[in-house]
Regions:
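Polybasic, lysine-rich low-complexity intrinsically disordered segments
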Residues: 1-2, 6
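Structural preference for solvent-exposed beta-strand-turn elements
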Residues: 9-206
Length: 215
């Protein structure tokens, strides 16, 4: 069943996640039926900027506070944020009844052209066809962008394809990826009011919310 409280008679699709390890502490609150409002602090400015883009363009509301061993590097913090965001989507989507399930977007940003396709199927898979011209933007290691989306895919039970079609500016490429992901999420999690069923022909009758619902 959809998790969350009712507001004005409407069931809100929400999730609260806390993850504490020896390397990080992440607190996250997600509302799928938001307005694109983000309150994000990871102490990694470029990553914060990317998550703000994803939040705004997906129209979800996201509060995320992360503290990690960024004095060593950003890997643990970025990956754990992906883990928590993925788990939050899995929980907030519940049995996925009535959602579009699929989302896709082709997004241009100056020189960059990015295509993202997403399926909240319950089957985790990431296809990543991105070549950043540089290895870093400022002090942010760009290989962590893939790590973030891999963690998200694994923990949300999503099939995700990300493809770079053009681009020469690494900042633009990364930002276009997060924006296109946001647009794809917005499409996929939207409720189709004409179809009040689980979006699958498998005929699911028993759902365990602790695991991704495979469609």
């Amino acid at each position: 069943k959809i998790k969350g409280k009712k507001v004005n008679g409407k069931q809100m699709r929400t999730s609260t996640i806390e993850r504490i390890t020896n390397e990080t502490k992440v607190n996250l609150v997600l509302n799928l039926d938001g307005v694109g409002r983000g309150k994000i602090k990871t102490n990694i400015p470029f990553f914060d900027h990317m998550l703000e883009q994803l939040t705004f363009h997906s129209s979800v509301d996201l509060e995320l506070n992360a503290r990690g061993d960024i004095d060593i590097d950003f890997h643990h913090s970025v990956e754990d944020c992906g883990i928590c965001l993925g788990k939050a989507f899995m929980e907030a989507l519940g049995d996925k009844k009535g959602i579009n399930r699929y989302g896709f977007f082709l997004l241009p940003m100056d020189d960059a052209l990015i295509r993202v396709a997403l399926d909240f199927s319950g089957r985790s898979f990431l296809s990543w066809k991105v070549n950043f011209p540089s290895t870093r933007v400022g002090n942010f290691d760009l290989e962590l962008v893939r790590e973030f989306f891999n963690a998200f895919s694994t923990n949300s039970g999503a099939t995700l394809h990300v493809e770079m079609l053009d681009g020469f500016n690494s900042h633009h490429i990364s930002e276009a990826i997060f924006k296109a992901m946001g647009k794809s999420i917005k499409m996929a999690v939207a409720i189709n009011k004409d179809v009040e069923i689980i979006p699958s022909t498998k005929g699911l009758s028993l759902i365990h919310i602790s695991e991704p619902t495979r469609l």
